[in-house]
Amino acid sequence: MPAPPLSAVILAAGEGKRMRSQRPKPLHVLCGRPMLLYVLDALSDCAVDKAVVVVGHGAERVTKMLSEDGPDLVIDHVEQHQQLGTGDAVSVGLTGLEEDGDLDGGDVLVLPGDTPLLRPSTIAALVDEHRETGAAATLLSARVDDPSGYGRVVRGRDGGVHAIVEDVDATDDQLAIDEINTSIYCFRRSVLAPALRRLSPEDNAQGEYYLTDVIEVLHDAGYPVGSVVADDPGEIAGVNDRAQLAAAESELRRRTVAGWMARGVTMVDPERTYLDATVELATDVTVFPGTLLQGRTVVGQGTELGPDTRLVDCIVGADCVVEQTVGRAAEVGDGAVVGPFAVLEPGAQVPPGTRTGPFYTGRLVDPTGPDH
């Protein structure tokens, strides 16, 4: 029997005031990619039929990025014109699924657009648990040492999930709960929209439509509500300010470096190596400390990079040595030795086998110049 349809609603309409930036929050960059793309990546193990991104602040810039760089997934977007809370945002998101009759009767994932550390396996486990138990809603929770600021998961004597209470609305007893809501859910689509219509902004201190209140609405109506506790609470960390952005990027960089080492790349000092997620490295590349590889940089087999080298959108051949060099949009041929203290300007090409020597500056050769 085929699995029921699965759609996803990604909430990416918030202003992100604490970022203090003109850039829309979903477009802040981690390891060379906009944050929102990592959230979409988390859907990759779930066979999602369609994803709807709810946009708001900077909507045009966010949708432009999705059209140019979005993953191989059917993605639509809808705009939340007024920030009336997460419940309203999901209601807006569901309008992006109304014309997709093939998705009726299925399930819908809801994820925030600012959780770039989510792993696909975690979301897949959430969907599997939701379907195996037949729950109307299944939430991803986590147990943490300091739950301050998070909504608490309130369970009954039977151990089942009864409600989620936001931090500002919680009683003293509820504030002592260490199980938090991650704002990540899987809902039976047929019950979600009716439950959203029962929300009231008068029921909470913020005067907003809380998506979290849907859990209590469903429980009180007799629907089963399930949960999955995240194995790694760090996965669900949101990015709300520059410090959290730096922490998330550090973890993504650690994963990226570890992944390349597992594929045959030597990192002499992993903690002092900085790789964008968009970089491509061949086997037996050696990266020395203080090296930054960014953008669409590609490095061939057996090449040594660094120390103290930064390459952005560069193509480096096999068996090269590039040390103490700064390069952008340049090419280095096989077997070339570049540096130390070299600069490769955009368009520069170092021929195969060249030894540039120290203090070299590579420039774009103009084919229309006097020597041509």
Q: What are these language model-derived features?
A:
Residues 60, 118-204, 212:
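Conserved core of the sugar-phosphate nucleotidyltransferase
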Residues 23-27, 79, 199-202:
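Short glycine-enriched, charge-decorated loop/helix-capping segments at active-site entrances
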Residues 28, 116, 185, 208, ...:
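Residues that recognize and position ribonucleotide moieties
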Residues 22-38:
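Short catalytic helix/loop segments, enriched in acidic residues and glycine
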Residues 1-21:
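N-terminal nucleotide-binding beta1-loop-alpha1 segment
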Residues 6-7, 48-51, 69, 94-95, ...:
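Catalytic cores of nucleotide-enabled group-transfer and carboxylate-activating enzymes in metabolic
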